[in-house]
């Protein structure tokens, strides 16, 4: 079982997104955060289960999609490092992940 580690920027982005959603619908924001954490925790057992981001076909990064979020991570059998969270409709910039 891999250890799931959230980076500070990933947590900040998720928090900012949840705060924005909560302005109109606090219950939806809470539900989204819970869904994201549930989906990411599954990576502890299956670290390679996320898809390879279409924008980064030859990279070590993977992503999990929990609408409206894309959650980017790197992982192996020992550790899953959650790196970045963004809204699905935003364009991914490679520098957001620290380069490839």
PLM feature segments, named:
Residues 66-70, 74-100:
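Enriched for short, Lys/Arg-rich terminal
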Residues 2-60, 97:
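Basic, Lys/Arg-enriched alpha-helical interface segments
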């Amino acid at each position: 079982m891999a250890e799931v580690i959230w980076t500070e920027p990933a947590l900040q982005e998720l928090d900012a997104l949840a705060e924005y959603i909560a302005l109109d619908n606090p219950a939806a924001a809470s539900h989204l955060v819970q869904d994201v954490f549930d989906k990411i925790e599954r990576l502890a057992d299956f670290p390679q289960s996320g898809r390879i981001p279409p924008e980064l076909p030859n990279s070590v990064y993977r992503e999990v999609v929990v609408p409206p979020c894309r959650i980017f991570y790197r992982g192996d059998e020992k550790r899953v490092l959650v790196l970045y969270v963004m809204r699905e409709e935003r364009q991914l910039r490679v520098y957001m992940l620290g380069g490839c």
